[in-house]
Amino acid sequence: MLSAFVLLLACLGLGVGVARYARPPIGLAQALNWWVIQIALPALVLGIVPSLHFDTALWFLVVTQWGVFFGAWALIAWVGARAHWSRGTIGGLILVTGLGNTSFLGYPLLEALRGRAGLQLGVVADQLGCFIMLAVGGVLVAARYGGATVTPTEMLRRVLLFPAFIALVVGVIVGQLGGWPDMLATMLDRFALTLVPLALFSVGLRFKLKPQPGQWAPVALALSWKLLLAPLLALGLALLTGVGGAVMSIGILQTAMAPMISAAILADQHYLDPPLANTVLGVGILLSLITVPLWSLALP
């Protein structure tokens, strides 16, 4: 787990340092974001999905991730309308508030806090819960709040042509056919390994640890939902439905993870207040290193 944290902080810090003390080429962050969304993220999905197995008894892991996303959408849209936030701000906040870092931060945290068995359950929540929300819900939010009015047909087209969604469909088919040959699996893994360092470096290029004037309220709302309110609601759902044990604990811990890196990248690509989205992401990652272990201590 320590090595994963060091990588996260090093890549983020390197981006901050380059932005402050070097002269990065114009458009560097956008170029890195293109690679992350078009190449690295689909490669990750293509590598993981074929080996994923789902049991209906694990529904809680999936539904809680969907609930985090739609709950964030409802909350941010309602508050944003009354606070007169711009459409870009609302859309960017929905993305980073509704989608969690359930893989690159979630996997090492779960393995450290709950062992290998906890990690296996966490993969289900990540791939079938949070990732599907990125591939479908995230694209819908980006289309709706990204500027010009988009027809339902155009929204559907964007979802179906989103590279990671295509990778999800292909991955399911490949899984039914027995998986990838070893050489292709290794190649996909190598491409996927570029996602975390490049994405965090890109975020670091625009990262501001201290929110700018006017950002305090949106940042506080976003992280209150992501790190506190969403896990509490997931706990309430578990108590109401009788879900317990490891499934309950892992489901709640995955709802409590920091904002998703790829969500901030998506916000950047669609001009959904990138400075705010990156601030929520960076501050959320740092705070979650404290709040997630506290949640783990509180859960059975």
What role is predicted for each listed range?
Residues M1-P300:
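Alpha-helical transmembrane segments of multi-pass small-molecule/ion transporters
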